[in-house]
Amino acid sequence: MAKEKFERKKPHVNVGTIGHVDHGKTTLTAAITTIMAKKYGGTAKAYDQIDAAPEERERGITISTAHVEYESASRHYAHVDCPGHADYVKNMITGAAQMDGAILVVSAADGPMPQTREHILLSRQVGVPYIVVFMNKADMVDDPELLELVEMEVRDLLSSYDFPGDDIPIIVGSALKALEGEDSDIGVKAIEKLVETMDSYIPEPVRNIDKPFLLPIEDVFSISGRGTVVTGRVESGIVKVGEEVEIVGIRDTQKTTCTGVEMFRKLLDEGRAGDNVGVLLRGTKRDEVERGQVLAKPGTIKPHTKFEAEVYVLSKEEGGRHTPFFNGYRPQFYFRTTDVTGTCDLPSGVEMVMPGDNVQLVVSLHAPIAMDEGLRFAIREGGRTVGAGVVAKIIE
């Protein structure tokens, strides 16, 4: 058994607790780490250790997040918990904490509340693929019919945001009782059941290396006698010498062939996710490629100009704008390696957006950018970051 502790061969999955304030997210996080540490090794974290989350800066945005980790029978989990609602908004929009799945905590005594709804909407917008529900504070509810009612409400709410409400697993328990060590169905057993459910319901994420090849172009050189080289860090997948690739974004998509891959001045057979490489392109002229385009496996990514976005606008304290912006606002949108000007349409009924707000916008870019739903971007004015966003839905 002692050997088990040092096994780091388990697959790694990122999760987080979401839900309304005071419904017990942090208590649940503490309970999971405590109970899993006893079973599989690792460090138990107390409520106040998690609650005093350190401030981090992600793209200039101040976010308080607690990171804990624990093992289950088959996995290693990294788990994020945020102290305040604003921290969740910022975390999910910037992608500072990518979640392969979320644990939605709902108090059985109160049922779904405004932030429950908002966190489900955010999960949908930023592409959190799976949600598991923990109905907390079950020790405070004597009436089984009330539990059923709350469960139905939660399922309806999830369905209304396009999650499979009828099929989502709901575990009923009391994080507090579990933390106190009570070995009842709503105590320790409920936490064990929750983690087993995460193991079975949240699929293992596709590793970057297994996704299609994508390289955001940072620089372009021409090497006399050899042709044009583009450089950048491979975001996903693998490119092999001799393979056909597409240059996507800003201009019309063009096909070319990778005739060489170089890293640290050495020639390689392939470039893999995470590598900083130079890729030699056959027959492509220096002025046909530019920073801000991507090199990609043919047919896997398309250029778009119009999309719905979920956006967080930096507060004045974070170095953002001091004044609101209105419909027709035209900042720069920074995607991967470059800025593109775009125009913002506010939702009907929204007159203006204040610093510190989060909002859904429709963005129309002045040049097409290679994108998929879930792509993060920054909003800038003259090189200064004033917001962060994520592509929620592509329109055209």
Curated annotation (Swiss-Prot):
Transmembrane segments: none annotated. GTP binds at residues 19-26, 81-85, 136-139. It comes from the Bacteria. Residues 10-206 form the tr-type G domain. Keywords: Cytoplasm, Elongation factor, GTP-binding, Hydrolase, Magnesium, Metal-binding, Nucleotide-binding, Protein biosynthesis. It holds the Pfam family GTP_EFTU_D3. It is found in: Cytoplasm. GO terms for molecular function: GTP binding; GTPase activity; guanosine tetraphosphate binding; translation elongation factor activity. CDD domains: EF_Tu, EFTU_II, EFTU_III. Its main location: cytoplasm. Mg(2+) binds at residue 26. Residues 81-84 are annotated as: G3. Residues 60-64 are annotated as: G2. Gene3D superfamilies: P-loop containing nucleotide triphosphate hydrolases, Translation factors. GO terms for cellular component: cytosol. Residues 19-26 are annotated as: G1. Residues 174-176 are annotated as: G5. It catalyses: GTP + H2O = GDP + phosphate + H(+). Residues 136-139 are annotated as: G4. InterPro entries: EF-Tu_GTP-bd, EF-Tu_GTPase, EFTu-like_2, EFTU_2, G_TR_CS, P-loop_NTPase, Small_GTP-bd, T_Tr_GTP-bd_dom. Belongs to the TRAFAC class translation factor GTPase superfamily. Classic translation factor GTPase family. EF-Tu/EF-1A subfamily. PANTHER family: ELONGATION FACTOR TU, MITOCHONDRIAL (PTHR43721:SF22), ELONGATION FACTOR TU-RELATED (PTHR43721). Monomer. HAMAP family: EF_Tu_B. This is Elongation factor Tu.
